[in-house]
Structures are given as structure tokens and as C-alpha cells.
């Protein structure tokens, strides 16, 4: 079976259209960045609440943020990554923390 589609014009001529390959969406890493003011417990809470990490995984990521300056929380399509960044940023500001959450292409 051919992957091309056949179309009939009003004049009964057959036209062939090449099938196009759909590219998978680009993925983006959501990244938490270290600061000197946001408590470690709050970072763990963010990781559990917005990224569904269990306490052990959240603690590992929090320690990586603390010691290495930043860490990836998850990898998502652009729209979901943007939403996660906005949610984390809003939640941090509501709780008066300067936690910086960004996204970068994976």
C-alpha cells in the first residue's frame, strides 16, 4: 500500500501528494536555579507539588541545585514547560521567595 494519497480532480485526473513526516515537538528542560535565600524545604515542596517527584528524588534535585547551581526538574514540550515555569515562579513569589525557574531547549 502506498503512503501517498491519491486525489481526483473535477477533470478526473489523478494527482499524487507526497506524505509529510510529522516532526516530534521540541523538548525543553525546566530548570531550578540556586539562590542564597530560598529555603531548601521550599524547593523540595515545589519539586513535589509541580513536578510530582517523591521526597527522595526531590531531595536529590534540591541538593544538585544547592551544590551545582542549577538542576533539571523535568523535560516537557514548550507549552507545558512554559506553564511549569509560570506556576513555580508565581508560587515562589506568593511565598516571598526569589526562586528562579527557567526553561532551556533539551
Swiss-Prot record:
**PANTHER family xref list:** ATP-DEPENDENT CLP PROTEASE ADAPTER PROTEIN CLPS, ATP-DEPENDENT CLP PROTEASE ADAPTER PROTEIN CLPS1, CHLOROPLASTIC
Among the record's GO biological process terms, what is one? protein catabolic process
Protein name per UniProt:
ATP-dependent Clp protease adapter protein ClpS
Q: Which gene encodes it?
A: clpS
One of its Pfam families is ClpS
Tell me what organism the protein belongs to: Vibrio parahaemolyticus serotype O3:K6 (strain RIMD 2210633)
* Role this protein plays: Involved in the modulation of the specificity of the ClpAP-mediated ATP-dependent protein degradation.
- Coiled-coil regions in this chain? none
Q: Indicate the family of this protein.
A: Belongs to the ClpS family.
Amino acid at each position: 500500500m502506498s503512503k501517498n494519497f491519491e486525489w481526483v480532480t473535477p477533470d478526473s485526473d489523478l494527482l499524487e501528494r507526497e506524505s509529510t513526516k510529522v516532526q516530534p515537538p521540541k523538548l525543553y528542560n525546566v530548570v531550578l536555579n540556586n539562590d542564597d535565600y530560598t529555603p531548601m524545604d521550599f524547593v523540595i515542596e515545589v519539586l513535589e507539588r509541580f513536578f510530582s517527584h517523591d521526597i527522595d528524588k526531590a531531595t536529590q534535585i534540591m541538593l544538585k541545585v544547592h551544590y551545582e547551581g542549577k538542576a533539571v526538574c523535568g523535560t516537557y514540550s514548550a507549552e507545558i514547560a512554559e506553564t511549569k515555569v509560570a506556576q513555580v515562579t508565581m508560587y515562589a513569589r506568593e511565598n516571598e521567595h526569589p526562586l528562579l525557574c527557567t526553561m532551556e531547549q533539551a
